[in-house]
Swiss-Prot record:
CDD domains: RuvC. It is found in: Cytoplasm. The lineage of its organism: Bacteria, Pseudomonadati, Pseudomonadota, Alphaproteobacteria, Rickettsiales. One of its GO terms (molecular function) is magnesium ion binding. This is Crossover junction endodeoxyribonuclease RuvC. Its main location: cytoplasm. Keywords: Cytoplasm, DNA damage, DNA recombination, DNA repair, DNA-binding, Endonuclease, Hydrolase, Magnesium, Metal-binding, Nuclease. Binds 2 Mg(2+) ion per subunit. Its EC number is 3.1.21.10. The RuvA-RuvB-RuvC complex processes Holliday junction (HJ) DNA during genetic recombination and DNA repair. Endonuclease that resolves HJ intermediates. Cleaves cruciform DNA by making single-stranded nicks across the HJ at symmetrical positions within the homologous arms, yielding a 5'-phosphate and a 3'-hydroxyl group; requires a central core of homology in the junction. The consensus cleavage sequence is 5'-(A/T)TT(C/G)-3'. Cleavage occurs on the 3'-side of the TT dinucleotide at the point of strand exchange. The active site is at D7, E67, D139.
Length: 159
């Protein structure tokens, strides 16, 4: 079973693909979708949608998992994050792929064992759990952690 994990952002959306075979988790690939700062919001959202669609057609995931939004003090950044998530979710919906979302503290707990873990701790555990030797960004590790959380969550029924 292939799971695509997504760490949404208007600037740098992290993505990570893992495969699950029984209790074995295998790292397949990961990366970051970067948008151009001078582009309009519509172009940025269109680029994110297009790249997510390319990932879906390339990896054919059984399930897509995404980090939930948390509203912070900066209202405008929260709104743009919600818009990026909407663009991503519309692509997932068009392909009718099984979908789940997880709060950041639930993801941290699944990976590190503590909901208040630091980003570098999540990154280290993702690399350790998935036997990743190369350098990965925090956006990639967050996306891979989200995919991993989906793999251990009861919402995914392995057939």
């Amino acid at each position: 079973m292939i799971i695509l994990g997504i760490d949404p952002s208007l600037v740098s959306t992290g993505w990570g693909v893992i495969s699950i075979s029984g209790s074995i988790v295998n790292y397949i690939d990961s990366g970051v979708i970067k948008t151009v700062s001078k582009d309009s919001l519509v172009l940025k959202l269109g680029n994110i949608s297009l790249m997510i669609e390319k990932l879906i057609t390339r990896f054919n995931p059984f399930h897509v998992a995404m980090e939930e939004v948390f509203i912070n003090k900066n209202y405008s950044s929260s709104v743009t994050l919600i818009q990026a998530r909407g663009a991503i979710m519309s692509v997932i919906g068009r392909y009718n792929i099984d979908f789940s979302e997880y709060a950041p503290n639930k993801i941290k707990k699944a990976i590190v064992g503590a909901g208040k873990a630091e980003k570098h701790q999540v990154q280290q555990m993702v690399k350790l759990l998935m036997h990743i030797k190369k350098a990965i960004s925090k956006d990639e590790s967050d996306a891979l952690a989200t995919a991993y959380t989906a793999s251990v969550n009861h919402q995914i029924k392995i057939i």
